[in-house]
Amino acid sequence: MKRFTRDEIAQRVARDIPEGAYVNLGIGLPTLVANHLDASKEIFLHSENGILGMGPAPAPGQEDEDLINAGKQPVTLLTGGAYFHHADSFSMMRGGHLDICVLGAFQVSKTGDLANWHTGAPDAIPAVGGAMDLAIGAKRVFVMMELQTKTGESKLVGECTYPLTGIACVSRVYTDLAVIDIHPDALIVREMADGVTLPALQKIIGLPLQAA
């Protein structure tokens, strides 16, 4: 079966972000979304280190060492963009002022619980950052992730076994095989990669799925 590439996943997320939305892009895979937003839409990107009005990655050779996102990657600033204190940034996150946040994940449960800061492994370095604030503070939480671990287990699970970031906070999951909405009583498959069938997807995930 064919899988969506990381950029294709980012394109799919970008397509679902509406005009006028205030959006935080988490560290890692979610940062790719900035490069695929429709230029005709006015969308305000927020970074927790204190940026609002963040643009896409700069062209090679045009990087500004003083302009980076929370993941320390070079970014650009759109006309009208602003810098501000870290405390003000977290006030925006915690105060319910963000319409959408896009986060990566180690696990997402069938009820929308999110685990994305620690695997519990003794040699792993916990890195919660602002994820808990975003997971609870944003009006909607989108997750971008590969559906399976390196050993083939589904990251979409009945119940998270890793430490939780937030409870019942994830509304939609974008993966390399499918886009899945999380509802209190069902997992609804919105879209699948070419060659992927609902029975095959259900076998990988191991949970009941419904077609949209």
Cite the ranges covered by each PLM segment.
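N-terminal active-site beta-alpha-beta segment that forms phosphate/nucleotide-binding
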Residues: 1-78
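Conserved phosphate- and dinucleotide-binding cores of soluble alpha/beta proteins
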Residues: 4-8, 59-212
